[in-house]
Swiss-Prot record:
The gene is ompA. This is Major outer membrane porin, serovar A. Coiled coil: none annotated. Residues 1-22 form the signal peptide. Belongs to the chlamydial porin (CP) (TC 1.B.2) family. In elementary bodies (EBs, the infectious stage, which is able to survive outside the host cell) provides the structural integrity of the outer envelope through disulfide cross-links with the small cysteine-rich protein and the large cysteine-rich periplasmic protein. It has been described in publications as the Sarkosyl-insoluble COMC (Chlamydia outer membrane complex), and serves as the functional equivalent of peptidoglycan. GO terms for molecular function: porin activity; structural molecule activity. Part of a disulfide cross-linked outer membrane complex (COMC) composed of the major outer membrane porin (MOMP), the small cysteine-rich protein (OmcA) and the large cysteine-rich periplasmic protein (OmcB). It comes from Chlamydia trachomatis. GO terms for biological process: monoatomic ion transport; regulation of cell shape. GO terms for cellular component: cell outer membrane; pore complex. Pfam families: Chlam_OMP.
């Protein structure tokens, strides 16, 4: 049985090095791996000994914490209906009637959409308080940066198509978008911002060289969106440090997307994650491979901020954006009826709330211990995310 356990854990640890896939699970035996310090010798006393003091029971560790999520499995967390203008139904421009000015409930194209890619990279300092070489209370303080990519339907990219309103009348028309642009891609990059996490880990059961342990962690960060890219044939644009409207319904202010816009705030994403895990390790001299299971719940909330396409405050050559014509029939004719009918107008998107699509995952890794004072852990996580983790620490 021991040989089988050794084989399974060693295979898992070696596999992690060749298949690097938010919060790490960590080695369940970590609280008891480093029993000596670089400044003070370890003390393996009995908690029931009346002569033992808390100074003998407590030790500190510090080190580097690196966590690299290459693909977090996420989906949107939105309502089934979305408020916007009614979809156009006329066959040609000549049949256009009044432009939509009232919102109606339509099926939300963002409902249940899966994100194509979600990445997050964190570098931090690691600090742990150890009790009786069995329990760890730890925290990390550092910086994180992220990247998100998904179908434009996940971001409710919408615009107005087939308008009868002339460019000179847009300021007072109060028109709402009527077309969902679902065949495009939206991606965003965040800045590097402060991130922190706290957690606890305990070695619950030991039998020879095997250790069964559990951990609980919480992490938080709030990066701002550094760059937003919309890759859409009908309306393609890039915004550096985008700003938008929180809690605003259509129609947006006519100045939305211009330098004169007011009432906007920076687009930022509030990241939260909870995680609980259970893992089993087996020590083989310097190496301690482990395998674990975890349950986690993550959310990315941007307050459903609505961001408008950049445009000019006043028309130049009767245009305010560089959106192309849809059918190739558009002409620039000043004050002509239907002059803007063939181009996409008042385009905007919103950053919807996202959450984990899968809650359970597995982790495999190994820890290398030197002189009972230093340790380096390498880990990979699969199923609910593809991620790699590196931790290097020493005991005082």
């Amino acid at each position: 049985m021991k040989k089988l356990l050794k084989s399974v854990l060693v295979f898992a640890a070696l596999s992690s090095a060749s298949s690097l896939q938010a919060l790490p699970v960590g080695n369940p035996a970590e609280p008891s791996l480093m029993i000596d310090g670089i400044l003070w010798e370890g003390f393996g006393g009995d908690p029931c000994d009346p002569c033992t003091t808390w100074c003998d029971a407590i030790s500190m560790r510090m080190g580097y914490y690196g966590d690299f999520v290459f693909d977090r499995v996420l989906k949107t967390d939105v309502n089934k209906e979305f408020q916007m203008g009614a979809a156009p139904t006329t066959r040609d421009v000549a049949g256009l009637e009044k432009d939509p000015v009232v919102n109606v409930a339509r099926p939300n194209p963002a409902y249940g959409k899966h994100m194509q890619d979600a990445e997050m990279f964190t570098n931090a300092a690691y600090m742990a308080l150890n009790i009786w070489d069995r329990f760890d209370v730890f925290c990390t303080l550092g910086a994180t940066t992220g990247y998100l990519k998904g179908n434009s339907a996940s971001f409710n990219l919408v615009g107005l198509f087939g308008t009868k309103t002339q460019s000179s009348g847009f300021d007072t028309a109060n028109i709402v978008p009527n077309t969902a642009l679902n065949q495009a891609v939206v991606e965003l990059y965040t800045d590097t911002t402060f991130a922190w996490s706290v957690g606890a880990r305990a070695a619950l059961w030991e039998c020879g060289c095997a250790t069964l342990g559990a951990s609980f962690q919480y992490a938080q960060s709030k990066p701002k969106v550094e760059e937003l890219n919309v890759l859409c044939n009908a309306s393609e644009f890039t915004i550096n440090k985008p700003k938008g409207y929180v809690g605003a319904e259509f129609p947006l202010d006519i100045t939305a997307g211009t330098e004169a816009a007011t009432g906007t705030k920076d687009a930022s994403i509030d990241y939260h994650e909870w995680q609980a895990s259970l893992a089993l390790s087996y020590r083989l001299n310097m190496f301690t491979p482990y395998i674990g299971v975890k349950w986690s719940r993550v959310s990315f909330d941007a307050d459903t901020i609505r961001i408008a396409q950049p445009k000019l405050a006043k028309p130049v050559l009767d245009t305010t954006t560089l959106n192309p014509t849809i059918a190739g029939k558009g002409t620039v004719v000043s004050s002509a009826e239907n002059e803007l009918a063939d181009t996409m107008q008042i385009v905007s998107l919103q950053l919807n709330k996202m959450k984990s699509r899968k809650s359970c995952g597995i982790a495999v890794g190994t820890t290398i211990v030197d002189a009972d004072k230093y340790a380096v852990t390498v880990e990979t996580r699969l199923i609910d995310e593809r991620a790699a983790h590196v931790n290097a620490q020493f005991r005082f």
